Swiss-Prot record:
Binds to STX1A. Interacts with DNM1; this interaction inhibits the binding of DNM1 to AMPH and DNM1-receptor-mediated endocytosis. Residues 7-26, 33-49 have a biased composition (Low complexity). It is a single-pass membrane protein. It is found in: Membrane; Synapse, Synaptosome. It comes from Rattus norvegicus (Rat). The modification Phosphoserine is found at residues 200, 204, 219. Its main location: membrane. The modification Phosphothreonine is found at residues 214, 235. Residues 1-74, 191-244 are annotated as: Disordered. Pfam families: Syntaphilin. Keywords: Coiled coil, Membrane, Phosphoprotein, Synapse, Synaptosome, Transmembrane, Transmembrane helix. One of its GO terms (cellular component) is cytoplasm. This is Syntaphilin. The lineage of its organism: Eukaryota, Metazoa, Chordata, Craniata, Vertebrata. Residues 79-161 form a coiled coil.
């Protein structure tokens, strides 16, 4: 009996287990959990089982009157509960993995952004460093430029000082050129005046009385009262030719001769008797009778006549006089050209071969309308008292001692060539230009080349002229050089002709 009871109980329990319907279980997330696969095959329950009725009975809250139903999990077996937990964990794991993937994606995006930001920051840093380096270089360049500006300023200051010195030098040169031009003008005017006075002073006693004038008329305006003084047109051509005036003679001999004549004239002014006493002296032992001595003697006698302004007899024999006058006579004798004296003497010897041979003899020349033959005087020296001529129109006789030396005739032939050369040189006109045009052009242009080069090379400041006065003058002379040379040549030819006419 007992065995049957236990078997019936086991069968009822197994039937219960088999007849238990599948229960839908909801987890905490609201998901339905299915029954186990092991119970699926045995679950052929009937309608009379009490468990399904309960579940169907308490499905609504209004049915159980506010009492919460028990969780369906408590009716599951532990294995089913484990399965449910595993499923729940898998779902959570899946959600977590999805979240992790999303966060990894976000992290990747953030990393990408960070890398971009880093790159941008690096670029900005590079730009900043480059800007700092450029700033440093710019500061260095600014310093260098400041140094360059300072050096340029110093150089400009030095150049300005140099330019000021150059301008001062240029002004000095301009002043020198102006002074030179002025002096040249004065010299040209003086030469022209000397030529004019030389032509008019053909009968001056200190210059024009040569040995040839002893045998001709005296053309002094003071002696000949009917002629005007200083007028070359009133002087005959033969008188001017015999006067032997040379415009280019030395000034020293002229002044010394004038001093001699002034001394004689002062001696005449002292008084008539004193002049007659002083005018009679003898230089025989000290000065032998020579051509120069005769020339000076005749010049002094003519000066005495010019100062007295009267026609008087002039004595030819002299006594010893003051040593000052003798010194002057020595200087004048040394200043005279010996060659011209010898040539004149030789020509005179040829013209007058029949003259007296006595060294103490003299020749009397009558100054009048027509020259007369020389009158030889063979007597010794005698003292003559000057007497006033009552008739001023009568001629005046001048007595000059003559020395006939044989050595002079021999020396005249030796000095003829030198005299001809000197006379030709004196006849040549003065010319400031050369024979070739190119030489004159180079002489005018070459001194202006450094100034022009300096003006072209230097930096011209505002208001500074681009020309130099000296270079401008030279440029004008260069342009008009041909005309200047032609005008100068045309001016020098008439002067040469006039001077040649006044010479012997």
């Amino acid at each position: 009996m007992a065995m049957s009871l236990q078997g019936s109980r086991r069968a009822s329990a197994g039937s219960r287990r088999r007849t238990s319907p599948p229960v839908s279980v909801r987890d905490a997330y609201g998901t339905a959990s299915l029954s186990s696969s092991s119970n699926s095959g045995s679950c052929k329950g009937s309608d009379s089982s009490p468990t399904p009725r309960r579940s169907m009975k308490y499905t609504l809250c209004s049915d159980n009157h506010g009492i919460k139903p028990p969780t369906p999990e408590q009716y599951l077996t532990p294995l089913q509960q484990k399965e449910v937990c595993i499923r729940h964990l898998k779902a959570r794991l899946k959600d977590t993995q999805d979240r992790l993937q999303d966060r990894d994606t976000e992290i990747d995006d953030l990393k990408t952004q960070l890398s971009r930001m880093q790159e941008d920051w690096i670029e900005e840093e590079c730009h900043r460093v480059e800007a700092q380096l450029a700033l440093k270089e710019a500061r260095k360049e600014i310093r260098q430029l400041k140094q360059v500006i300072d050096t340029v300023k110093n150089n400009l200051i030095d150049k300005d000082k140099g330019l000021q010195k150059y301008f001062v030098d240029i002004n000095i040169q301009n002043k020198k050129l102006e002074t030179l031009l002025h002096s040249m003008e004065v010299a040209q005017n003086g030469v022209a005046k000397e030529e004019g006075t030389g032509e008019s002073a053909g009968g001056s006693p200190a210059r024009s009385l040569t040995r040839s004038s002893t045998y001709t008329k005296l053309s002094d305006p003071a002696v000949c009262g009917d002629r005007q003084a200083g007028d070359p047109s009133n002087t005959p051509a033969e008188d001017r030719a015999d006067s032997g005036f040379v415009a280019a003679d030395d000034t020293l001999s002229r002044t010394e001769a004038l001093e001699a004549s002034s001394l004689l004239s002062s001696g005449v002014d002292c008084g008539f008797e004193e002049a007659s006493l002083h005018s009679s002296f003898n230089l025989g032992p000290r000065f032998p009778a020579s051509n120069t001595y005769e020339k000076l003697l005749c010049g002094m006698e003519a000066a005495v006549q010019a100062s007295c302004m009267q026609e008087r007899a002039i004595q030819t024999d002299f006594v010893q006089y003051q040593p000052d006058l003798n010194t002057i006579l020595e200087k004048v004798g040394q200043a005279q050209g010996c060659s011209s004296v010898l040539k004149d003497r030789h020509s005179e010897l040829d013209l007058h071969p029949s003259g007296p041979r006595d060294p103490d003899s003299a020749v009397v020349v009558t100054v009048g309308d027509e020259p007369e033959a020389p009158e030889p005087i063979t007597r010794g020296p005698a003292i003559h008292r000057p007497a006033v001529n009552s008739n001023p129109g009568l001629p005046v006789s001048v007595v000059c001692p003559v020395e006939e030396e044989e050595e002079a005739a021999a020396a005249a032939a030796a000095a003829a060539a030198a005299t001809t050369t000197t006379t030709t040189t004196e006849k040549e006109p003065k010319s400031y230009w050369s024979r070739h045009y190119i030489v004159d052009l180079l002489a005018v242009v070459v001194p202006a080349v450094p100034t022009v080069a300096w003006l072209c090379r230097s930096q011209r400041r505002q208001g500074q002229p681009i020309y130099n006065i000296s270079s401008l003058l030279r440029g004008c002379c260069t342009v008009a050089l041909h005309s200047i040379r032609r005008i100068s040549c045309s001016l020098s030819q008439p002067s040469a002709g006039s001077s040649g006419g006044s010479q012997l």
